[in-house]
Amino acid sequence: MRIKPDDNWRWYYDEEHDRMMLDLANGMLFRSRFSRKMLTPDAFCPTGFCVDDAALYFSFEEKCRDFELTKEQRAELVLNALVAIRYLKPQMPKSWHFVAHGEMWTPGTGDAASVWLSDTAEQVNLLVVEPGENAALCLLAQPGVVIAGRTMQLGDAIKIMNDRLKPQVHCHSFSLEQAV
């Protein structure tokens, strides 16, 4: 199923579920990964889905196509990215979990990034939501990962210093039939 932003979408905070929500106006609701303690005061006033939200939606949607995720997972990642960029409180970097690299990469909004866990050298895929001069707010762009005993799930937020981030390399495999 493909979702498409429209003027009837509404942001609101749901007390019962303790989550930021998006009413998709067609009987569907999106429940974000973010609870009250993670949200700015603006999140507690219902508001419409604006033109800037729609522009970011399409930008994130396009940039997320290269992630090895299902359509449903990509939609969830994109909508969580919108919540994060609009309503998430500032976070402190948690970079000590990741390997530092010699060079500093400055990512852009929507870039696919990778980091490597310090303890296992496992690669972790991220979506850059809010880049900064020294660190970037990212969302986990894979179904899950365990970092220092804590399980993170698709769409969870983490801020990481730029010297830990690297651009994600996308390897596309093609069959002989596709090449001909």
Curated annotation (Swiss-Prot):
Q: Does the keyword Transferase apply?
A: no
The record ties this protein, via InterPro entries, to: ZapC, ZapC_C, ZapC_N
Q: Which GO terms describe its cellular component?
A: cytoplasm
Q: What's a GO biological-process term for it?
A: division septum assembly
Q: What is its main location?
A: cytoplasm
Using the record, list the residue span of the signal peptide; answer none if the entry has no such feature.
none
Q: Where in the cell is it found?
A: Cytoplasm
Q: Which domain of life is it from?
A: Bacteria
Q: Name one Pfam family in it.
A: ZapC_N
Keyword list (alphabetical) reads:
Cell cycle, Cell division, Cytoplasm, Septation
| Record's subunit section | Interacts directly with FtsZ.
**Protein's job:** Contributes to the efficiency of the cell division process by stabilizing the polymeric form of the cell division protein FtsZ. Acts by promoting interactions between FtsZ protofilaments and suppressing the GTPase activity of FtsZ.
The Swiss-Prot or TrEMBL record describes its family as follows:
Belongs to the ZapC family.
> What's the protein name?
Cell division protein ZapC
Species for this entry: Salmonella typhimurium (strain LT2 / SGSC1412 / ATCC 700720)
Q: Which gene encodes it?
A: zapC
